[in-house]
């Protein structure tokens, strides 16, 4: 097997896997190699997204559930077997759901997750593709990301996150654009961007220093410190922390109370709170996406992503 190019993620990881297992006894190495390659190859089974436009109409998706009841629109990450990792289609579905929620009869909009995780963030398999298509994949990814974040910047109603478990990456950074964040005491908040050679997103390079101060923001965004729910509350990212045993009951009782408040007053108040910052947020979002677009095609990024996939697959053995 010839050595593959740096952006042929699955084949390159397979190459590394074969070399890494070379020191094991022959039969053990053979079995482990087959298991590892099978795991890596499953990463590439999803249909290619590289040529799909970000303005494509979102399809109905079982991975994003949208319900509306008692004045509350609930948007649920519903991919528990993948720790609610966000696929390309889920990004489109969320944008579609937010557009509908902005004009429906609900008073507030709530995000939460199914299962143990709130969301493990961007599904890195979104960026696995053939070497010849990497530029298209990166361009599409950053275009969708910019539109996705702008949807949160523009959303006119109160936006609440009900963080039922661990949150990673963009599932954390986007929280700074919410109006309230309620967390279970078992939730954690992790932004391992430097580990993955990625640029922070969702206006976090501006909002995190504003919320928690520059040194604490750097601890998360540069050095990848994982925060407990209590630490996130102390730093201002989380509004309130609830015991896991009473989390759902207490939070939803609170939310039903919020849904009885004046919708017009809350919309006007949110507009006044956000209006002086909105243009700044658009600018920061554009700058972060431009930096990501410039960064992603580099070999260092490809190597970090490849190593992540290799470690993840090897851990399953």
Swiss-Prot record:
Q: Where is this region: Disordered?
A: 40-60
Q: What is its main location?
A: other
Classification via Pfam families? ACBP, ECH_1
Q: In which tissues is it expressed?
A: Expressed at high levels in the kidney. Also detected at very low levels in the duodenum, jejunum, ileum, heart, liver, lung, and brown adipose tissue (at protein level). In the kidney, expression seems to be localized mainly to the proximal tubule.
- PROSITE patterns this protein is in? ACB_2
What does the record give as the reaction this protein catalyses? a (3Z)-enoyl-CoA = a 4-saturated (2E)-enoyl-CoA; a (3E)-enoyl-CoA = a 4-saturated (2E)-enoyl-CoA; (3E)-nonenoyl-CoA = (2E)-nonenoyl-CoA
Q: Which GO terms describe its molecular function?
A: delta(3)-delta(2)-enoyl-CoA isomerase activity; fatty-acyl-CoA binding
Could you list this entry's UniProt keywords, alphabetically sorted: Isomerase, Peroxisome
Task: Please indicate which superkingdom the organism of origin belongs to.
Answer: Eukaryota
- Compartment(s) of residence: Peroxisome
GO terms for CC?
peroxisome
Residues binding substrate are 120-124
Question: What EC identifiers does the entry list?
Answer: 5.3.3.8
Give me any GO biological process, just one.
fatty acid beta-oxidation
The record places the site described as Important for catalytic activity at 201
Enzyme class comes to isomerase
Q: Ranges for the ACB domain?
A: 1-46
Task: Kindly state the positions of the motif Microbody targeting signal in this protein.
Answer: 315-317
Please name the Gene3D superfamilies in this protein's record: 1.20.80.10, 2-enoyl-CoA Hydratase, Chain A, domain 1, Lyase 2-enoyl-coa Hydratase, Chain A, domain 2
> What job does the chain carry out?
Catalyzes the isomerization of trans-3-nonenoyl-CoA into trans-2-nonenoyl-CoA. May also have activity towards other enoyl-CoA species.
Domain notes for this protein: The ACB (acyl-CoA-binding) domain is truncated and may be non-functional.
- Record's family? Belongs to the enoyl-CoA hydratase/isomerase family.
What protein name does the entry list? Enoyl-CoA delta isomerase 3, peroxisomal
């Amino acid at each position: 097997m010839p050595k593959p190019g740096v952006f042929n993620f699955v084949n390159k990881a397979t190459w590394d896997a074969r070399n890494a297992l070379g020191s094991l006894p022959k039969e053990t190495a053979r079995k482990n190699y087959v298991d590892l390659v099978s795991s890596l190859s499953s990463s590439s089974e999803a249909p290619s997204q590289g040529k799909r436009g970000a303005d494509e109409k979102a399809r109905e998706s079982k991975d994003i559930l949208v319900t509306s009841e008692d004045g509350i629109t609930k948007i649920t990450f519903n991919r528990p077997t993948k720790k609610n990792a966000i696929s390309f289609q889920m990004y489109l579905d969320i944008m579609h759901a937010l557009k509908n929620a902005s004009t429906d009869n609900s008073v507030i909009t709530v995000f939460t997750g199914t299962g143990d995780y709130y969301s493990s963030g961007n599904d890195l398999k979104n960026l696995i593709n053939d070497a010849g298509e990497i530029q298209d994949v990166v361009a599409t990814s950053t275009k969708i990301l910019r539109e996705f974040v702008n949807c949160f910047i523009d959303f006119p109603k109160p936006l609440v996150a009900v963080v039922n478990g661990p949150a990673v990456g963009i599932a954390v950074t986007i929280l700074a654009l919410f109006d309230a964040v309620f967390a279970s005491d078992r939730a954690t908040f992790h932004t391992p961007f430097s580990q993955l050679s990625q640029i922070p997103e969702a206006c976090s390079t501006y909002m995190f220093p504003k919320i928690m101060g520059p040194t604490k923001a750097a601890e998360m965004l540069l050095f990848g410190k994982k925060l407990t729910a209590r630490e996130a509350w102390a730093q201002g990212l989380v509004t309130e922390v609830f015991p896991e045993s009473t989390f759902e009951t207490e939070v939803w009782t609170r939310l039903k109370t919020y849904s009885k408040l004046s919708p017009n007053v809350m919309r006007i108040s949110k507009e006044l709170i956000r209006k002086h910052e909105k243009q700044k947020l658009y600018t920061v979002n554009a700058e972060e996406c431009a930096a990501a677009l410039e960064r992603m095609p580099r070999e260092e990024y490809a190597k970090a992503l490849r190593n992540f996939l290799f470690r993840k697959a090897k851990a399953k053995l």
